[in-house]
Amino acid sequence: MQNINPTQTFAWNALEQHKAENLTIPQLFNEDPKRFDKYSLRFEDQILVDFSKNAINQHTLALLRQLADECQVKSATYAMFNGEKINRTENRAVLHTALRNRSNTPVEVDGKNVMLEVNAVLAKMKGFCERVISGVSKGYTGKAITDVVNIGIGGSDLGPYMVTEALRPYKNHLTMHFVSNVDGTHIAETLAKINPETTLFLVASKTFTTQETMTNALSARQWLLDTAKDESAVAKHFVALSTNAKEVAKFGIDTENMFEFWDWVGGRYSLWSAIGLSIALSIGFEHFEQLLDGAHAMDKHFLNAPAEQNIPLTLALIGIWNNNFLGAESEAILPYDQYLHRFAAYFQQGNMESNGKYVGRDGKFVNYQTGPIIWGEPGTNGQHAFYQLIHQGTKLIPCDFIAPAQTHNPIGDHHPKLLSNFFAQTEALAFGKSKEVVEQEFLQAGTSLEEVVEIVPFKVFTGNKPTNSILVQKITPFTLGALIAMYEHKIFVQGVIFNIYSFDQWGVELGKQLANRILPELENNETITSHDSSTNGLINQFKLWKQ
């Protein structure tokens, strides 16, 4: 990957000039009644992406695609898919795409076809899932497994939890639990719900040394042994998603039940790997494979579709337009599907940990905005919480609205009511309500304007708020896999254009280092003076109150 400062490209400077045209969404629709047809794309006739409600025209898109060309997005894409070590700061390839490479075409890293190992781990996962789900695998008292607890953090938790929640309509009889926080409350509340005789723990840590994960795993291990009274029970109730065979065996786990993944799998892209074992146990391996199929189909689309029809590329470029030229600082992801209630949180990590960087690939501080803040909640809950600010606040917040045409729970008229809100919100954000319309509504209600002249400004909506509408035929393992991969590739494209390394996360390290230094200070009764006055004061008050 080349070091290309995007602000030095012809396209970037042309976009700066183009911004002065002050395009507005209502104006663009007035000029082109068939705008929807020209500014929407379809994937496999199962996903429709409508980006027409953005302040863009064909000239905007042409310049944005030229920016992608000047920043060599296509060659960077080939480099990633081909196993080149594009994660330069860690000297690693980036191959989450290989994990779902259903075509099974060879992918080489250091002259070795990684697909052989990928397929071997998938086969091992399949056999394990079949034994647990069928009841062949039993706990230390001979009872079948009923509950599965995934112990991980970050990508080892967010992805599996999001997907198992999103695909709950496909779940089997196993009850899934997820523990991530080192706060003892999280593991304690989970253990209170389950039976040690029928619980399986998945410990997800590549190194098997992650502080939060191993703290929780050791507490779970002790909880099991308090009942079982026999160390051999650990091997029947714990498996490892790890590469550290020595530590796994030391813990008491049979290394035959250690599921490997590789250093070219980033945590926030790892749900496709052995880290997804909890997903496969929850929905069955056949459905897990369909999840991989959907992601692979989107991978092929991203790799092969021309720029004009390329969904991840288009979404990435529109995001850059809103972020770097129109001044948006955040993006909201708003799924109108309760099963997707963790989707925004998942891509909060996916985007902000990937592109929240201020150092370019040239090692210098950038002088432009990089990744946006990502946030969101399911509709319609958000409408009664933060939509007020999106509609009438002073910040520009582009939104992605996601909804299924078909619901898994067709109860009464719930779904039409939900979708009516989905459609209404993007229309309201785009077109707003003028002063004249507000006044006319008062007149039609029999109220004179003299009575309400002071109220009218508060009921005006300026509109011109950008949104993407992503309509899915139905949330299935296939369409969910495609949606996740779509956002992954959007993030990748933006990172290439931002000229940053999207696949490291050095920003998480400093806090961990300082926490390791502070921990011993919390275990004695001495007054602490080794930090700044604020940190000293907080630690000393904690020590006083914990007595």
UniProtKB/Swiss-Prot annotation:
Molecular function via GO: carbohydrate derivative binding; glucose-6-phosphate isomerase activity; monosaccharide binding
Which Pfam families does UniProt cross-reference here? PGI
GO CC field? cytosol
Q: What is its EC number?
A: 5.3.1.9
Question: Any keyword Aminoacyl-tRNA synthetase?
Answer: no
Which GO BP terms, alphabetically?
Answer: gluconeogenesis; glucose 6-phosphate metabolic process; glycolytic process
The annotated pathway is:
Carbohydrate biosynthesis; gluconeogenesis; Carbohydrate degradation; glycolysis; D-glyceraldehyde 3-phosphate and glycerone phosphate from D-glucose: step 2/4
Q: Where in the cell is it found?
A: Cytoplasm
Q: Which domain of life is it from?
A: Bacteria
Broad enzyme group: isomerase
Q: Which residues form the active site?
A: E353, H384, K512
Q: State which residue ranges cross the membrane.
A: none
Alphabetical list of NCBIfam families matching this protein = PRK00179.1
* Protein's job: Catalyzes the reversible isomerization of glucose-6-phosphate to fructose-6-phosphate.
Under HAMAP family, the record lists: G6P_isomerase
Name this protein carries in UniProt: Glucose-6-phosphate isomerase
Record organism:
Glaesserella parasuis serovar 5 (strain SH0165)
Name of the gene encoding the protein in the UniProt record = pgi
